[in-house]
Amino acid sequence: MYSLSDFDFELPQELIAQTPLAERSASRLLHVAQDGMIDRAFADIVDLLNPGDLLVFNDTRVLKARFFGVKETGGKVEVLVERVIDSAHVHAQIRASKSPVPGMKIRLADAFDVIVGERAGEFYELQFPGDIFALIEAHGRLPLPPYIEHAADAYDETRYQTVYAKTPGAVAAPTAGLHFDQALLDTLKAKGVQFAYVTLHVGAGTFQPVRNENLAEHNMHSEWYTISQETVGAVHAAQAAGHNIVAVGTTSMRALESASQSGSLQAGSADTRLFITPGYTFKTVTRLITNFHLPKSTLLMLVSAFAGYDAIRAAYQHAISQRYRFFSYGDAMFLTRMPPC
């Protein structure tokens, strides 16, 4: 039985990637194989996949979800849109010296006013005055992760999105997908590797460390996903032919496994609080492409459940010793599902 301290590790600060490499696919890839570890280039992913294998990408698009504003009382606030609820309302985190109250107006980006609604846990409901996505795109700022020390610029607005991002709604990028450029996608397709897409809107909770030593006490954050019947058909066809289902990132993994709780993948949309820890039985995914994750994070627990705790522990020690780049703008791993006990 694992506890929180089992997922802690010391990471030299200089290994936290602050900027992306000049070329998306120029990053490194640590291949954690059954018989050891192999240092590769990310472009080698072509050699690790066979014709008929199915890559499942998360096509969410990161919103410019961060705003700075002023309450009608004059106090400064910072707003992070967590989720778009409908055409007029969002859930958002608000940082202010004094908590806003329902009915209060907040001027955002010196451009438009939102009205504060009821508070639900750590989020406030905010009413926007018009097209939410248009206002966010025009006036918001890209919300880079807290460990990236520079303010988002125009370069980040391109590079903190996947090249196939389509469905706006995330406040963090599905970072394993950042390594794929169009040339690499074309090479994979020419080899006969198949593509499918899910949408899971990554929330700010993805960066939150677990705080309970007893993992069973952790309150997992909620994220919304949708999986089409077309994707379900592609997964079932690949499985029937004996091919691998390769999740591009933990967010694709979370969507696929959340929709497979009946035993096989089902189409639909839902909120998921699925918390994957060692001992979980994977139902759909057989391979995983993922970046290196934060200490004590739910994502580190997920990859440990998938590839094996000891294998991941050794892989992270190897990555640190070999100076891999960590976190969102960092390098990647290619993992094989651990055989069931």
Curated annotation (Swiss-Prot):
Q: Where in the cell is it found?
A: Cytoplasm
Catalysis: reaction(s)? 7-aminomethyl-7-carbaguanosine(34) in tRNA + S-adenosyl-L-methionine = epoxyqueuosine(34) in tRNA + adenine + L-methionine + 2 H(+)
Q: Which of the seven top EC classes does this enzyme belong to?
A: transferase
From the UniProt record, which GO molecular function terms apply? S-adenosylmethionine:tRNA ribosyltransferase-isomerase activity
Q: What is its main location?
A: cytoplasm
Which pathway does the database say it acts in? tRNA modification; tRNA-queuosine biosynthesis
Q: What is its EC number?
A: 2.4.99.17
Asked whether the UniProt record includes Transmembrane helix among its keywords, one would answer no
Q: Which UniProt keywords apply?
A: Cytoplasm, Queuosine biosynthesis, S-adenosyl-L-methionine, Transferase
Biological process (GO) annotations? Answer: queuosine biosynthetic process; tRNA wobble guanine modification
Q: Which Gene3D superfamilies match?
A: QueA-like (3.40.1780.10)
GO (cellular component) term, any one = cytoplasm
By sequence similarity, the record places it as follows: Belongs to the QueA family.
Subunit composition and interactions: Monomer.
Q: Which PANTHER family match?
A: S-ADENOSYLMETHIONINE:TRNA RIBOSYLTRANSFERASE-ISOMERASE (PTHR30307:SF0)
Please name the HAMAP family in this protein's record. Answer: QueA (MF_00113)
What does this chain do? Transfers and isomerizes the ribose moiety from AdoMet to the 7-aminomethyl group of 7-deazaguanine (preQ1-tRNA) to give epoxyqueuosine (oQ-tRNA).
NCBIfam families attached here? Answer: PRK00147.1 (NF001140), queA (TIGR00113)
State what protein this is by name. S-adenosylmethionine:tRNA ribosyltransferase-isomerase
Q: What is the lineage of its organism?
A: Bacteria, Pseudomonadati, Pseudomonadota, Betaproteobacteria, Burkholderiales
